[in-house]
């Protein structure tokens, strides 16, 4: 494409607080429609909001994590607009004085890294939800109204759709590491609007932008941005002009469609909410939140490399998700073997999670049990092949690995006499292959090992099998 793509993202992160932003109603997802509602949610006369302290603390945490300037004094404002799922007629947000500003998020792109600047992070409450798939009518569920959000607004620093996706994934990783959100895009815990424009390469002036909504996965974010960039290019090449508007992404059709003309800030008539006092963040809160920050992925990966002597690639994979990193570290503590633990978590564990669509918290084998299984391998009680059989049994059996090995008769055979006898049977049964091996076809060594292991049902000690076989074949 002869144009440069320019993208900025507005990410809405739903906080995992127990109660809503300005009242005591439950903020839990999935409750029956219109059951988590009170006079404050609906702004009924006389109902006064009170800011949830946890919302401020979470905002400070992500501000510190992204290098933002955290304001000691910020203002909650009313964002006025009319929509069926906004019963109050306004949304409590922040405008002129946000709680966090001027931060940065570093993303990995290809061979290097890029820093994406943040304009602001501000507190906001969510709106309700319109439901269009029940008969011919539209229904309103206001359970979500008042659920706390943090809006993370970037500068238009992204130049490809992949960079935008990488940025969004990094935001998700940060909020999950902080423990302030589950980052679930399918449930709407993490939503993003993309501001997209194009300009000729070398130009410093921004083109007219469109805002894209309704993207519920990282892949859809990429597809929507790429489609919109191509649409802009085609319009400009045909001599047309881009209309500044909000567009919806239709994942089924793979295209965007016009939703409404793009609003400007003055259209919302922001003004300080007269029912809410300013948000004050003192030095004590800043220091307390700083002490609560976790070890972030980059630092944790570096520690894994130095402390456990595992490859940098393994460390990077294991620290993408905080819960997986915790699981791995506990497995190492129990097993005493970081490299084997790394192989198992990156291999069997992650494969199972992917196949069964599970999070690590839902996984049926605890880090303690996996560590005990790895310890049996290290002790020579079972081979790695048998360990995989035990692993599959452990998925549906809560017994310890050692109990399963004993019960199923899976202990490794290390008796030299027993292994020697089986090897002799294999050689006697395959005289042709034996002659070929001794004639120079040494690749048949693996054939003999396989035959021996098959006769011993995988329980032969591999080191002893290999050693004895080499001696027999040389005789």
Curated annotation (Swiss-Prot):
SUPFAM superfamilies: GatB/YqeY motif, Glutamine synthetase/guanido kinase
EC number: 6.3.5.-
SMART domains listed in its UniProt record: GatB_Yqey (SM00845)
Catalytic reaction list: L-glutamyl-tRNA(Gln) + L-glutamine + ATP + H2O = L-glutaminyl-tRNA(Gln) + L-glutamate + ADP + phosphate + H(+); L-aspartyl-tRNA(Asn) + L-glutamine + ATP + H2O = L-asparaginyl-tRNA(Asn) + L-glutamate + ADP + phosphate + 2 H(+)
Covalent S-S links between cysteines: none
UniProt-recorded Gene Ontology molecular function terms: asparaginyl-tRNA synthase (glutamine-hydrolyzing) activity; ATP binding; glutaminyl-tRNA synthase (glutamine-hydrolyzing) activity
GO biological process: glutaminyl-tRNAGln biosynthesis via transamidation; translation
Keyword terms, alphabetized: ATP-binding, Ligase, Nucleotide-binding, Protein biosynthesis
PROSITE patterns, per database record: GATB
UniProt-listed Pfam families: GatB_N, GatB_Yqey
Purpose: Allows the formation of correctly charged Asn-tRNA(Asn) or Gln-tRNA(Gln) through the transamidation of misacylated Asp-tRNA(Asn) or Glu-tRNA(Gln) in organisms which lack either or both of asparaginyl-tRNA or glutaminyl-tRNA synthetases. The reaction takes place in the presence of glutamine and ATP through an activated phospho-Asp-tRNA(Asn) or phospho-Glu-tRNA(Gln).
Subunit structure, interactors included: Heterotrimer of A, B and C subunits.
NCBIfam families per the UniProt record, alphabetical: gatB, PRK05477.1-2, PRK05477.1-4, PRK05477.1-5
Family assignment from sequence similarity: Belongs to the GatB/GatE family. GatB subfamily.
The name this protein goes by in its record: Aspartyl/glutamyl-tRNA(Asn/Gln) amidotransferase subunit B
Species name: Chlorobium phaeobacteroides (strain DSM 266 / SMG 266 / 2430)
Higher taxonomy: Bacteria, Pseudomonadati, Chlorobiota, Chlorobiia, Chlorobiales
């Amino acid at each position: 494409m002869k144009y440069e793509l320019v993208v900025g993202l507005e990410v809405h992160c739903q906080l995992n607080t127990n109660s809503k932003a300005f009242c005591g109603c439950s903020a839990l997802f999935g409750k029956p429609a219109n059951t988590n509602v009170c006079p404050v949610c609906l702004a009924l006369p006389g109902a006064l909001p009170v800011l949830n302290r946890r919302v401020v603390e979470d905002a400070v945490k992500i501000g510190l994590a992204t290098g933002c300037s955290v304001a000691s004094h910020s203002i909650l404002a009313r964002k006025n607009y009319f929509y069926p799922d906004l019963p109050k007629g306004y949304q409590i947000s922040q405008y002129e004085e946000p709680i966090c500003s001027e931060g940065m998020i570093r993303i990995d792109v290809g061979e290097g890294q890029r820093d994406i600047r943040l304009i602001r992070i501000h507190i906001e409450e969510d709106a309700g939800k319109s439901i269009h798939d029940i008969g011919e009518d539209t229904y309103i569920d206001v359970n979500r109204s008042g659920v706390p959000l943090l809006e993370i607004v970037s500068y238009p620093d992204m130049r490809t759709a992949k960079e935008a996706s990488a940025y969004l994934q990094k935001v998700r990783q940060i909020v999950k590491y902080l423990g302030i959100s589950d980052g679930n895009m399918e449930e709407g815990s993490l939503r993003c609007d993309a501001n997209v424009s194009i300009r000729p390469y070398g130009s410093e002036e921004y083109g007219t932008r469109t805002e894209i909504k309704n993207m519920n996965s990282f892949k859809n974010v990429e597809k929507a941005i790429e489609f919109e960039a191509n649409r802009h290019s085609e319009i400009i090449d045909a001599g047309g002009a881009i209309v500044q508007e909000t567009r919806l992404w239709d994942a089924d059709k793979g295209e965007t469609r016009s939703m409404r003309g793009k609003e400007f800030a003055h259209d919302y008539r922001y003004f300080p909410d007269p029912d809410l006092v300013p948000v004050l963040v003192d030095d004590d809160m800043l220091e307390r939140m700083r002490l609560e920050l976790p070890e972030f992925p980059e630092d944790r990966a570096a520690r894994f490399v130095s402390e456990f002597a595992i490859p940098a690639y393994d460390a990077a994979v294991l620290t993408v998700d905080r819960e997986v990193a915790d699981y791995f570290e506990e497995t190492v503590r129990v097993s005493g073997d970081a490299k084997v633990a790394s192989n198992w978590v990156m291999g069997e564990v992650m494969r199972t999670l992917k196949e069964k669509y599970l999070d690590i918290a839902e996984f049926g084998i605890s880090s303690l049990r996996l560590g005990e299984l790895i310890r049996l391998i290290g002790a020579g009680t079972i081979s790695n092949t048998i360990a995989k059989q035990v692993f599959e049994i452990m998925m549906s059996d809560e017994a310890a690995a050692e109990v399963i090995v004993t019960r199923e008769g899976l202990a490794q055979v290390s008796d030299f006499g027993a292994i020697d006898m089986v090897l002799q049977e294999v050689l006697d049964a395959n005289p042709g292959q034996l002659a070929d091996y001794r004639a120079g076809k040494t690749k048949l060594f693996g054939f003999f090992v396989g035959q021996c292991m098959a006769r011993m049902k995988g329980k032969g000690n591999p080191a002893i099998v290999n050693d004895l076989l080499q001696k027999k074949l040389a005789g």
